[in-house]
Structures are given as structure tokens and as C-alpha cells.
Amino acid sequence: MVTEVTEGIKVSVTTRFMEDYSNPENDYFIFSYQIRIENQNPFTVQLLNRHWEIWDSLSGKRIVDGEGVVGQLPILESGENYQYESACNLDSEIGSMKGIYTFKRLFDGTQFEVAIPIFYMEVPVRAN
């Protein structure tokens, strides 16, 4: 698990290789990632947008931007957390993701950015 706190928002990420959905013979590797977002501020916030930088050891870097996460614009009161799971496909056995969430403070409408810590996706080594 990797964790980072920015502007009072704690973001934790875990990953796993999805062997049943991958096809290594065709350079297709699926990884799931689980994210937990905790509001450690004394005020309510709302997640508005996400920005991902996805790196693949064969294909290089790609950018993904979008509204919210998994179709949601979660609102987190002080002390609350929000968890979700998503997936990423790579063309190789090794890659990484990092990014930024844009949040809004509901008491005054100001927006701020929160770092999503870099996390690595690697196919587990098999012992013979």
C-alpha cells in the first residue's frame, strides 16, 4: 500500500494483477487498483475531477482526465472516507500510475489539488 496526504486529504492505494482477465501472449495485462480517500479536514469536501499519468514499460506514458471517479462525485464530511476500485490495462508486465484529484471545499467553493501517490503494477514472478 502507498499513502500520501495533501491538503488534509489522505489517499491510499493498493494494486493487484488480474491474471484471469489478462492475456500475456497478446501483451495484454490487467491490474486492479483500490483507492481509499479520507477527509482529515474539519470541513466537507467534494471530489470533482481526476488526472492520471499512466506509464507502461512498452508503450510509454498516456494521460487520462475525467470527471469524478467511477461515475461518482463523492462528498466527504470531516473524518469520512470513500473507497472505490477500478482497473488499468497495460501492454507490458510493468507499469505505474500517479495523478491528481481536484477537490472543492463546500463551505466556500474554492478548489484544490490532491496528489495521488505513484503506485506500481507488476506481474508477480512465478517460481518453477
Listing of model-derived features with the role each one plays in the protein:
Residues I37-N41:
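Asparagine-centered strand-capping/turn motif at beta-strand->loop junctions
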Residues T44-R62:
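Short acidic, flexible loop segments centered on an aromatic residue
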Residues E25-F29, T44-Q46, I75-E80, E93-G95:
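A generic structural micro-feature
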Residues N89-N128:
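Terminal connector regions
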Residues M1-Y28:
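Low-complexity, acidic Ser/Thr/Pro/Gly-rich terminal tails and inter-domain linkers that flank the onset
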Residues F29-Q34, K98:
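Short, solvent-exposed loop/turn segments enriched in Ser/Thr/Gly
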Residues D56-S59, Q72-N81, M121-N128:
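Short, surface-exposed linear segments at secondary-structure transitions and domain or protein termini
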Residues R62-I94:
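Intrinsically disordered, low-complexity Pro/Gly/Ser/Thr-rich segments with frequent PxxP/GP/PP motifs
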